[in-house]
């Protein structure tokens, strides 16, 4: 839904402004498709979407 996407985009924008990378884990196919269509995946960076929490945590460690 549009309001959810707006809220997510604002959240990520605040995080980026503060030097924080937001990493998404285990996003299901349908919500991911909505995020992709909205341009949110490109905004966040496709590499910040991980298939599971272990991958997300391992990726986060590489950013530290």
Labelled PLM ranges:
Residues 1-64:
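Structured cytosolic domains appended to multi-pass membrane proteins
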């Amino acid at each position: 839904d549009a309001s959810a996407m707006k809220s997510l985009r604002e959240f990520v924008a605040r995080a980026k402004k503060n030097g924080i990378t937001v990493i998404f884990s285990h996003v299901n196919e349908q919500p991911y498709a909505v995020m992709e269509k909205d341009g949110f995946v490109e905004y966040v960076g496709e590499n910040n979407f991980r298939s599971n929490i272990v991958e997300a945590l391992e990726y986060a460690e590489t950013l530290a």
